[in-house]
Design a protein with these regions (language model features):
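GHKL (Bergerat-fold) ATPase N-terminal catalytic module, capturing the glycine-rich phosphate-binding loop
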Residues: 1-189, 197, 220, 439
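GHKL/Bergerat-fold ATPase module in large chromosome/replication-associated machines
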Residues: 118, 139-158, 178-639
């Protein structure tokens, strides 16, 4: 028969499809398996109403056969097959989908299709075969036909359709593989191990058994005996045809059919984790978008989690066929640590399964999963606190950055999941637990920030707050103060840094007395400010300190911990984003009394003392003095 031209598009379009649409050559096998599954679906559906089909559900299968000698890969099915006209229609027109037409007819007939899922975009996925094959041959015998037909093409030049013989109903797709090049090894797709790898990766959950040759080793009797008269055994490699796909996804099974232990084992195998997940979340949603999901909250972060190389996202399936290895659109950034799968028959796919045509369905799924994850984490916090704290110690910072990102858009979602170390209780508490435990006369949520919770709890600035019997939250991550800044308040209680000037702890009488003291010791504070110069924005008499001589507080919106964070950034200007330091003096401390006396009797010595006390305040705040060597010399001068 004369060669026919492709009806829909030119050579250029076919080349564009082959070279551009699919980013991975290996998905050609996924597409051809999906088409085979579609064909079996159709015949299985026919068998429900046509007794002449003569096949039970267990009779259907897909077979993959690699032939290294002839350089061919054959994908066979015993599905409904195609007539010559259907070959013309489905294979001769690029982007025409026979499977799509079948599904529309099925929907229109409003028949019972609970067990019939069509996953193909047949006319498109079929052409992915040309990525690896120099020639594609399709031999198909349609159900109800006595003869078969052969469709053959070597690419965009066209195709031929000729009658041929085939004993059974079904389709064989035979790929004559391209020759290997320096850049591409096409023959690898003929090897049994590679076929198994790709089926496991993309088509493990296709509903029909996929058979292929599997190489195994077995012992055999050599016919020889040893000195003791015992038969000698040898080991040989044998090839047997086996079913290599799981068929029924674990997420499609009920809790009775798949226990939590089964799900955990699945997680460890598929996601290469050695530890049990903190939680397993199962979702079965029906509605505008129907889908099933199985999500896992890991117990530890992947080794590359905090690097640019880490790619978040859930595995996305359509009726058991993997569409994307990692779909980032299914998870908000704040829950990027969650791993798992989503499987939906309702996803709209475009010309390639690797790119979704519309993202509306994904947005609906993502919004629902976000609520499910939040609900599960809230449940853990309430019912299994030890397990939740284990999770939070690993991923709590991620939740905090989730609030900081998008200008606080996720604050309502995440705030109640946060934990901070209580200085009073010496354990992690939520903001709700902190507020519920506050005395009636406590105005603010007090917090202290340092490099570690232990250091934060011991800051000199905490003395006045703790003397009142008020608890303090210990901030120790880069995100903590930014979170407090964005939240502003919780349960109508504002956040207050213990390093702030006004802690709201003084009565009007105490404020008046303090103002009088400030005026009385103004010569001392002026002297220290003049001595320290621009190193401090101000020097004040402290209203916070009890046991320490000095401490640093700040004026303005940038705190000492924020400054530390900004200056740790690559290329940061050390003179930019600086906290406005205020040195506070404790008049009741012997060192400050000695400073004031020296100011009046020996100003030169007093200047040395002022610098030493400032350096001490820096050290207590976790800040290295600008010139440690000078600090050492100043201390020696005082002896």
């Amino acid at each position: 028969m004369a060669k026919k031209e492709f009806q829909a598009e030119s050579r250029r379009l076919l080349e564009l499809m082959i070279n551009s649409i699919y980013t991975h050559q290996e998905i050609f096998l996924r597409e051809l398996i999906s088409n085979a599954s579609d064909a079996i679906d159709k015949l299985c559906f026919r068998s429900l109403t046509d007794e002449n089909v003569g096949m039970e559900r267990g009779d259907f299968f897909i077979r993959i056969k690699g032939d290294m000698e002839n350089g061919t890969l054959t994908i066979s099915d015993n599905g409904i097959g195609m007539t010559a006209e259907e070959m013309e229609s489905n294979l001769g027109v690029i982007a025409k989908s026979g499977s799509l037409a079948f599904k529309k007819d099925l929907d229109a007939a409003e028949k019972d299709k609970a067990d019939i899922d069509v996953i193909g975009q047949f006319g498109v996925g079929f052409y992915s075969a040309f990525m690896v094959a120099s020639k594609v041959t399709v031999i198909s015998r349609a159900y109800g036909q006595e003869t078969a037909n052969r469709w053959e093409s070597e690419g965009a030049d066209g195709y031929t359709v000729t009658p041929c013989e085939k004993e059974t109903v079904g389709t064989d797709v035979i790929l004559t593989m391209k020759s290997d090049t320096e850049d591409d090894c096409y023959s690898v797709y003929l090897m049994p191990w590679k076929i198994q790898e790709l089926v496991k990766k993309y088509s493990d959950y296709v509903r029909w058994p996929i058979r292929t040759d599997v190489e195994t080793t077995e012992k055999y009797e050599t016919g020889e005996v040893d000195e003791a008269g015992i038969q000698k055994m040898g080991v040989r490699t044998v090839t047997k045809e086996e079913v290599i796909n799981s068929m029924i996804p674990i997420w499609q099974r009920s809790k009775k059919e798949a226990s939590d232990a089964d799900c955990i084992a699945f997680y460890k195998e598929k996601f290469k984790d050695t530890e049990d997940p903190v939680s397993v979340i199962r979702v079965n949603a029906e509605g505008t978008v129907s889908y099933r999901a199985m999500l896992f909250v890991p117990a530890k972060a992947p080794y590359d989690y905090y690097t640019r190389d880490y790619v978040p996202g859930l595995r996305l399936y359509s009726n058991g066929v993997m569409i994307m290895e990692k779909c980032p659109d299914l998870l908000p950034e704040c829950f990027r640590f969650v791993r798992g799968i989503v499987d939906s028959p309702d996803l709209s796919l475009n010309i390639s399964r690797e790119m979704l045509q519309h993202d509306r369905q994904l947005k609906l799924i993502s919004m629902n999963l976000e609520k499910k994850i939040k609900g599960e984490l809230s449940r853990l916090m309430e019912c299994d606190r030890e397990k939740y704290e284990k999770f939070f110690n690993v991923f709590g910072t991620q939740l905090k950055y989730g609030i900081i990102g998008d200008y606080g858009m996720k604050r309502d979602l995440l705030t109640d999941l946060l934990l901070y170390r209580s200085a009073e209780k010496e354990k992690l508490v939520s903001l709700r637990e902190y507020v519920d435990a506050m005395p009636e006369n406590q105005k603010y949520i007090y917090y202290a920030a340092a490099e570690t919770p232990e250091r934060a709890a011991k800051l000199p600035q905490t003395e006045q707050v703790r003397a009142k019997g008020f608890d303090i939250l210990c901030f120790s991550t880069d995100a903590d103060e930014f979170v407090a800044e964005i939240l502003g308040s919780y349960a109508e209680k504002k956040f207050c840094n213990v390093c702030s000037q006004d802690l709201g702890l003084e009565s009007d009488e105490e404020k008046a007395a303090a103002d009088k003291t400030d005026e009385e010791f103004k010569p001392l504070t002026d002297f220290v400010k003049e001595t320290l110069g621009d190193a401090v924005a101000n020097v004040k008499i402290s209203r916070k300190l009890k046991n320490y001589a000095v401490c640093l507080s700040v004026e303005g919106g940038i705190t000492l911990e924020m400054e530390r964070y900004f200056h740790a950034m690559p290329g940061a200007d050390p003179n930019a984003m600086r906290a406005q330091r205020v040195l506070e003096l404790n008049l009741d401390h012997p060192a400050v009394k000695a400073l004031d006396a020296a100011r009046q009797e020996n100003p030169e010595r007093a200047a040395v003392m002022a610098k030493v006390l400032f350096a001490q305040a820096q050290l207590v705040a976790g800040i290295t003095p600008d010139d440690p060597a000078e600090y050492g010399e100043l201390v020696c001068k005082l002896f």
